[in-house]
């Protein structure tokens, strides 16, 4: 008789990622307090589920997050993760529970404006990787630090201090099934990498998990280029700027890497709406710069 672990595994993952979202936000806020950031009362959130934005009266921070990056991989047991970004904002986002009609709409619009900030306004970002080990990477704008969950003591232990992504690499992480749909500059660069005719003269290999957290985590440790570029089918790519692209770009840049759409820095783009999508390439600075140079010469 064949037994399936799918229902129990999915239930476990759902519970686990909810716990880690709360844990990550608490850790980040505590760190912000320790580093003498402003007082925290309550926190507003925007996430990748159906409920776009939740704002509480008097909050000092806005947390944006992707609860379970790579959720389509759950059945296959492939690494998944959680992405979180935290922004600071003004005190003018207070919703009166007695308000009605246009007054509420105006106040809610102000709350949304407080959420739609460029990545340059991030005060903290983190991701948690759920794999053979549970890793947490955090930045407060002064380097990237990784922690591994030690199950024997039930605590996160510092495993990598002041992470620096190697400037050179020979690995790229992209879904090459879409190669024919990519922009010509990107195709030319990747073709050169595969053939060993790129700027480095080294032949690249492909390593693609299909989970942004998993691929970026490996890139931070070993070097490489992670990309989810736009193509003829999805011109703007598929990653969400506010709660995927910007927080992960903050982490990558703090580790000494580059993150771009190919034409502009991801961190400098102000979202126009919560689920706005953008193309992304990030990683080792010399390899990513080769892509940027190709676009600039187009």
Language model region names:
Residues 1-18, 22-27, 32-298:
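IMPase-like, lithium-sensitive Mg2+-dependent phosphomonoesterase catalytic core
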């Amino acid at each position: 008789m064949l037994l399936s672990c799918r229902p129990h595994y999915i239930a476990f993952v759902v519970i686990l990622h909810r716990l880690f979202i709360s844990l990550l936000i608490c850790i980040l806020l505590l760190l912000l307090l320790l580093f003498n950031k402003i007082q925290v009362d309550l926190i507003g959130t925007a996430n990748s589920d159906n409920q776009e934005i939740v704002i509480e009266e008097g909050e000092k921070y806005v947390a944006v997050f992707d609860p379970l990056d790579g959720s389509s991989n759950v059945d296959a047991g492939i690494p998944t993760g959680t992405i979180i970004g935290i922004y600071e904002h003004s005190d003018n986002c207070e919703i009166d529970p007695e308000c009605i009609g246009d007054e509420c709409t105006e106040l809610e619009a102000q709350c949304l404006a407080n959420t739609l900030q460029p990545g340059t306004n991030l005060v903290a970002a983190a991701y948690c990787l759920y794999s053979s080990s549970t890793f947490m990477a955090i930045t407060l704008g002064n380097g990237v630090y990784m922690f591994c969950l030690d199950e024997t003591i039930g605590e996160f232990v510092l495993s990598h201090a002041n992470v620096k992504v190697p400037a050179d690499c020979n690995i790229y992480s992209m879904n090459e099934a879409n190669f024919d749909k990519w922009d010509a500059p990107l195709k030319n660069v990747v073709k050169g990498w595969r053939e060993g005719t790129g700027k480095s003269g080294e032949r690249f290999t492909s390593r693609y998990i299909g989970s942004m957290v998993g691929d970026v985590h490996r890139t931070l440790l070993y070097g490489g280029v992670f990309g989810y570029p736009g193509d003829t089918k999805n011109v703007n790519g598929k990653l969400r700027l506010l709660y995927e692209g910007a927080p992960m770009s903050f982490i990558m840049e703090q580790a000494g890497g580059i993150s771009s759409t190919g034409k502009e820095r991801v961190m400098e783009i102000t979202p126009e709406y919560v689920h706005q999508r953008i193309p992304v390439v990030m990683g080792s600075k010399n390899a990513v710069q080769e892509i940027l140079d190709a676009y600039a010469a187009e």
